[in-house]
Amino acid sequence: MRKIDWDKIKTRLDALLVIDEYLTDPSEDWLRLVIKTEEDYGLRYLIDNGSGDSLDVILTDKMILIKGFDHESSLSQFAADEWNQDIIDSFYKGLDEKYLSLYSKDQKDETTFFIWYDGHAHQQTYQDQDGGEWLLSYLFDSFERFHEFVTDYYEITVDKDLLRKLYMEGFLSDLELKQLIQDD
C-alpha cells in the first residue's frame, strides 16, 4: 500500500463534511453521510451511507486508523452461518492497545477491513477478501472522483472551480458555499 497522507485525508473528509452539512437539513441529522467529532485523541470521521456500510477514520497525532464495514461482505460476521470472533480479532492484530481501546466491542464487531498507518500501512487480509475496501473511495484520491460523487450523490450542479477549491483546501467561505451550488 502506498503512503497515506494525513493532511490529504483530513482535507478531503472536511470537504465532504462541508457539502454534507450545507445540504442536510439540521432537523434531519439522521440523513447525514458524514459526521466529524473532535476527541481527546484526535479527529474522528464517521461515514455511514444508510445502507449498512460505514467507514470510520481516526486521525491522531501519530496514527491514521481506517475501519470499514460492508454489510454484504463475506467477512461480515452478521451474515455468517456461524460467528467467528477470530476473524474480527485478526483485523486488529498488532495494533497497540491504546488505539484498540478507541473502539467499542460493537464497533469492532462491525469490521470487514481495518488499516492503520504509522508511517507504514498495516492490514490483515484474507484470501479472496471482499471486505468493503470500496469504502476507501470516500477518501477521494482525485478531484474527478470527488466531483462525480458530489454531483451524483447530492444530485446537484456545482461551480467546478469552487468545488476544486473545496477539494484542495477543505473549506469555503459562506459566500463561496452559496455560489458553489448552481441552479439548473
Residue ranges and their predicted role:
Residues 1-52, 61, 76-184:
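N-terminal domain-onset segments
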Residues 69-76:
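Short, solvent-exposed aromatic-acidic interface loops
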